[in-house]
Amino acid sequence: KIAPTVYTGYPGGDWRENLRLTADALNMVEEAEDLMKDYDKKVKEAAKKLEKYQDKTFSIIRWQGNNAALILKELPAGRALTDLGLQRPPAQDMEGKGHSEPVSQENLSDIDADYIFFGTLGGSSVGNTQAGGSADTEGAKEAIAEATKVPGFEDLYAYQEDHIIPVDGSLWTSTGGVLLMNAIVDQVVEFLV
């Protein structure tokens, strides 16, 4: 006999839809709706605190070895910035394919913005011998130091203005649900206010 199996969405999918599917399967629809309402309330309060940043642009990148990848609007961190009313630079103001989008070194300027949330997944990069380190903020700080060796990185506006914000890559550059979304919103406020 096989236990009941439920499809609850896919990584990179809309976290609200994934939560609704799971809640429906577990008979917890009201609880899920409460979680989403609480998130919306948190976002509304946070957006008020972030009003002075509404005309700034924000990039979210994952750095692996000596290369960057963009976290676009469909991934959780991108959705959180959109929810907060924060703008993305033109090269990132779009939905992606549900995963990070690699950026060649020739197009490194595509990661630039007024502020860059900079994460890494450390040694998790398959086949990349330069991908040492960890995914936490200390790992991001180490990756930023390594990134300065890449031609053009120090020319980025965000770097020159000291607006590169190291973040936990496992949180900011991965997929997740309501807990992850709340944590990202909390961190945006913590980093900027």
Task: Describe the function of each predicted region.
Residues 99-102, 117:
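Charged, long alpha-helical assembly modules
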Residues 1-4, 113-116:
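Proline-aspartate-enriched helix->loop->beta-strand connector
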Residues 2-66, 163, 170-193:
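Extracytoplasmic substrate-binding proteins
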